[in-house]
């Protein structure tokens, strides 16, 4: 573990029993008191599930496919990260309070921690899920490149923490299952990352319908082209390269690394995969939620 990085206990606390960045916990009263507006749209994901991809697609929809409009500012200003509270760059609640409607809100919060005002105002919520094995790989590389976060001892060590729910935002299993239950609400749209990779046109059409927007071939084509992985990886307004190395060191790992389905096969050993599968089966027993780990 790098001596320049703090320990896990220095950096993380618990919020409602869920591991969370201490800086976020200190300001969480502002999140709890957040005043939603009826036309707010909330994008919720467990970390590393395609949040930035979905956010950019929504920005393109809101701007009627105007690429230049979407490039005018970085994604974390256009879609503020609700519970994030950092000294210099992202202050989610403050950004959102100063923003004109309609607002697009990003959050990684589980159901029980999302501000109640979003439910009271009957806001539309989109939850994007991704298979757990690809999430844990992507999450591991994020932890390595975010300078302030303590490094895990190894990939295996991080997978163990992930299975135990001892990573920021807690258990992937509980997070995903609780939002799956909430998707019975017609105001909640539940999407799968794997479906988006397999047939992005179909999923964009689904988003347009959910948002009550008119679809045209021209608009959908523009959205698909602008939000392809390669386009977004090369786009400074979406790839987080505007952040200094002291925040995200992209020399360690790029923020937009691969975006593939099935990359977990390059990182899991046979033994670790068997252990993960057993744990997965226990955690997901009784759930109707099914994921694909390859397409």
Curated annotation (Swiss-Prot):
The active site is at 108 (proton acceptor). GO terms for molecular function: aryl sulfotransferase activity; estrone sulfotransferase activity; steroid binding; steroid sulfotransferase activity. InterPro entries: P-loop_NTPase (IPR027417), Sulfotransferase_dom (IPR000863). SUPFAM superfamilies: P-loop containing nucleoside triphosphate hydrolases. Pfam families: Sulfotransfer_1 (PF00685). GO terms for cellular component: cytoplasm; cytosol. 3'-phosphoadenylyl sulfate binds at residues 48-53, 130, 138, 193, 227-232, 257-259. The modification Phosphoserine is found at residues 216, 228. Substrate binds at residues 106-108. The keyword Lipid metabolism applies. One of its GO terms (biological process) is estrogen metabolic process. Belongs to the sulfotransferase 1 family. This is Sulfotransferase 1E1. It comes from Bos taurus. The lineage of its organism: Eukaryota, Metazoa, Chordata, Craniata, Vertebrata.
């Amino acid at each position: 573990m790098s001596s320049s990085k703090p320990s896990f206990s220095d950096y993380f606390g618990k919020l409602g029993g869920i591991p969370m960045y201490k800086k976020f916990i200190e300001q969480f009263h502002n999140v709890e008191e957040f005043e939603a507006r009826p036309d707010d749209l909330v994008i919720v994901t467990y970390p590393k599930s395609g949040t930035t991809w979905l956010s950019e697609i929504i920005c393109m929809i809101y701007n009627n496919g105007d690429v230049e409009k979407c490039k005018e500012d970085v994604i974390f200003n256009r879609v503020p990260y609700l519970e994030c509270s950092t000294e210099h760059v992202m202050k989610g609640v403050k950004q959102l309070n100063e923003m004109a409607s309609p607002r697009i809100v990003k959050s990684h919060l589980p159901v029980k921690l999302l501000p109640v005002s979003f439910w009271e105002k009957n806001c539309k919520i989109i939850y994007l899920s991704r298979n757990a094995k690809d999430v844990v790989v992507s999450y591991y590389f994020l932890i390595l490149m975010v300078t302030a976060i303590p490094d895990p001892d190894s990939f295996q060590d991080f997978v163990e923490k992930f299975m135990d729910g001892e990573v920021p935002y807690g258990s992937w299993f509980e997070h995903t299952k609780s939002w799956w239950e909430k998707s019975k609400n017609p105001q909640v749209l539940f999407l799968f990352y794997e479906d988006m990779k397999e047939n992005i046109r179909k999923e964009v059409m689904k988003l347009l319908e959910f948002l009550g927007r008119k679809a045209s071939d021209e608009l959908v084509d523009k959205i698909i082209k602008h939000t392809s992985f390669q386009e977004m990886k090369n786009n400074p307004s979406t790839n987080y390269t505007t952040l200094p190395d002291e925040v995200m060191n992209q020399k360690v790992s790029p923020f937009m690394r691969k975006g593939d389905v099935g990359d977990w096969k390059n990182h899991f050993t046979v033994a670790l995969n068997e252990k993960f599968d057993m744990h997965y089966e226990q955690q997901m027993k009784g759930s109707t939620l099914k994921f694909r780990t390859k397409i």
